[in-house]
């Protein structure tokens, strides 16, 4: 066994029996006791055991299936709103171009196929990559899949700050995208709130509502934006991103090999 110190208060090791060699459980347990943390948090360990039990079939399967269906319903609802707005701008959810309405979800429709425009990853290996339906990345206007900036745009940081002030907290924020996760317990009522707030953002943006009205906490922290409108702020940040080609700079930063 490797000498590893388990510092987490709820560390667990999952062991799958080998087909050719039986695990020496006594030796394994003694070795584990030698290197584990001396201060386990039993309440956390108990919660992990409860969570594992909840995931057992059939109840766990039903809970996961419900989360998957809610995530798909959210994507379909966002596309319905886009259709209702007609030629006006709206947010997109990153994912396959077509979604079935049948139950349960079909694994095939979430696979990434080579050179599909929606994912932009080029010639991916067939059957190797699949989009997790419960992880929804919402795309804001301003940057296309090729990394080209539009004349106007709405940086995701502005949208997520707006959402936070209206009671919606997102997981992660990029330049022109933000991420939400449909974990167990996310219901139609909760994601409907997100759709409603995004519609309200669109209305406030189109009307260039003053920031002191729609983002009062932001203005309180940064009084210099008191007389600026929501569209004005979005345009200013977008123009800065575009001027300095921030999308390409950040991409190169991660792809460039380290120079020594």
Language-model region placement:
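Non-catalytic terminal extensions of PLP-dependent enzymes
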Residues: 58-258
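Short beta-strand-to-turn element immediately C-terminal to the catalytic PLP-Schiff-base lysine
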Residues: 12-18, 55
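Short helix-loop capping/hinge motifs at secondary-structure junctions, enriched
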Residues: 18-26
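PLP-dependent aminotransferase class I/II
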Residues: 25-52
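Short, small-residue-biased leader/transition segments that mark boundaries at the very start
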Residues: 4-5
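Short coil/turn connectors at secondary-structure junctions
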Residues: 8-9, 167
């Amino acid at each position: 066994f490797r000498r590893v110190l388990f510092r987490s208060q709820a560390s667990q090791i999952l062991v799958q029996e080998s087909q050719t060699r039986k695990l020496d459980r006594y030796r394994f347990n003694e070795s584990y006791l030698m290197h584990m943390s001396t201060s386990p948090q039993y309440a956390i360990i108990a919660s992990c055991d409860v969570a594992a039990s909840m995931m057992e079939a059939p109840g766990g399967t039903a809970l996961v299936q419900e989360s998957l269906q809610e995530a798909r319903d959210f994507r379909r609802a966002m596309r319905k709103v886009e259709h209702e707005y007609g030629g006006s701008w709206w947010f997109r959810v990153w994912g396959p171009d077509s979604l079935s309405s049948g139950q349960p979800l079909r694994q095939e429709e979430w696979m990434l196929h080579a050179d599909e425009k929606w994912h932009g990853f080029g010639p991916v290996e067939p059957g190797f990559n699949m989009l997790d339906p419960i992880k929804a990345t919402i795309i804001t206007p301003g940057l296309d899949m090729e990394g080209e900036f539009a004349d106007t745009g709405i940086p995701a940081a502005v949208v997520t700050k707006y959402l936070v002030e209206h009671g919606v907290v997102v997981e992660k924020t990029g330049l022109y995208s933000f991420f939400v996760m449909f974990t167990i317990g996310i219901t139609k009522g909760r994601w409907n709130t997100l759709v409603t707030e995004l519609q309200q953002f669109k209305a406030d943006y189109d009307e260039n509502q003053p920031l002191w009205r729609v983002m009062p906490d932001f203005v309180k922290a940064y009084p210099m934006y008191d007389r600026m409108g929501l569209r004005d702020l979005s345009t200013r940040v977008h123009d800065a991103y575009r001027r300095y080609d921030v999308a390409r700079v950040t991409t190169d930063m991660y792809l460039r090999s380290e120079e020594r």
